[in-house]
Amino acid sequence: MFCRFSGCNLWNGREHGRKDAICRFCDTDFVGTDGDGGGVFASADILVDAVAATWQGASHPRAARFVVCTGGEPLLQLDAPLVEGLHAAGFEVAVETNGTRSTVPGLDWVCVSPKGGTDLAITSGNELKLVIPQDGVDPARFESLGFDRLWLQPMDGPDVEQNTALAVRYCLENPQWRLSIQTHKHIGIR
């Protein structure tokens, strides 16, 4: 399950701000939301209750309750009380972040998706997912960092076929990298 946070430190989320943004290729609507109350929660406990109520997983012993905190940039808002509350509700907690802010204690999985023109505050974790191509960004720059897995994801948009070919070729030539595709887009999950 995804828990999407609004706001980002690399782009304001509005088209008029894209040309001046550090990250100009974001494909996520993290400004507006169609959730109850506009997606605003008065406390960590209320958000935990909303996540738990949304969970549709069965009670099978192998059905892990897993929530990915994403954004925007989730580390602008994600804090220890929310992570603790999600754990208390039986969830494993992951974060997908641009890596420019420090993590919070207790996360079970850390995925960093670096953006060109930024410095990383997080240099180790479970996975690094690099969207390519990005101007001035060489995947080799990230190989010496402390991530368990390295993923290349083709940039979406009008050049997605060309970008996919680039990512596949790079992974074949550099097998320390794996290919990541946005499955939810290919099968129509919103």
Tell where the protein language model's regions lie, with residue ranges:
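Conserved beta-strand segments that form the floor/walls of ligand-binding pockets within enzyme
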Residues: 2-4, 25, 68, 111, ...
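Conserved AdoMet/S-adenosylmethionine-binding subsite of the radical SAM
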Residues: 61-66, 74-190
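Flexible, acidic/Gly-rich N-terminal and inter-domain linker regions that tether
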Residues: 1-32, 173, 178, 182, ...
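Conserved Radical SAM active-site core
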Residues: 10-107
